[in-house]
């Protein structure tokens, strides 16, 4: 009987230890906040700033039918845009998309007759997505790229456009 009691105590102790280990693992994996460090990435344009003839900027708040366009032709403004995008810190992670995003797009028209589009969708404060079909990327950014629309050159005229013109 003494041996049986000893075995029962050992068995119970082992089972309790296993249960505590399972609880600890579960807590570590599922209940503690997981902080994944995403490596920052940069845009690598397949062209140089000197190759850009002009940049068409498009913007709408939530509804594409309300889109407007500005055309950037001044070399300084083109260089400013180019450099801002080259210097952005982007992350290769998904964003939580919501309907009615504010969208600001940029079409870099190049001297060889081609163009390169960047589309920025803002889903909330410091929560945006920058994508390019030609560049083959879709990155998260906390940068306020939408502010380029208002702040680049306040003298640029915004004209209403048809939704079909959007990148």
Describe these PLM feature segments.
Residues 3-167:
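Function-determining sites in protein domains
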């Amino acid at each position: 009987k003494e041996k049986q009691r000893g075995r029962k105590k050992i068995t119970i102790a082992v089972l309790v230890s296993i249960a505590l280990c399972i609880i600890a693992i579960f807590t570590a994996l599922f209940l503690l906040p997981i902080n994944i460090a995403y490596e920052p990435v940069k845009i690598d344009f397949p062209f140089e700033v000197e190759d850009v003839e002009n940049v068409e900027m498009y913007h709408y708040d939530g509804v594409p039918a309300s889109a407007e366009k500005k055309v950037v032709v001044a070399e300084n403004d083109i260089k400013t845009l180019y450099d801002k995008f080259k210097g952005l810190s982007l992350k290769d992670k998904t964003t939580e998309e919501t309907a009615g995003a504010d969208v600001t797009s940029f079409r870099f028209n190049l001297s060889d007759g081609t163009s390169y589009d960047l589309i920025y969708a803002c889903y909330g404060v410091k929560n945006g997505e920058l994508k390019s079909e030609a560049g083959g990327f879709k990155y998260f950014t906390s940068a306020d790229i939408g502010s380029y629309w208002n702040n680049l050159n306040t003298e640029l005229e915004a004209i209403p456009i048809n939704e079909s013109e959007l990148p």
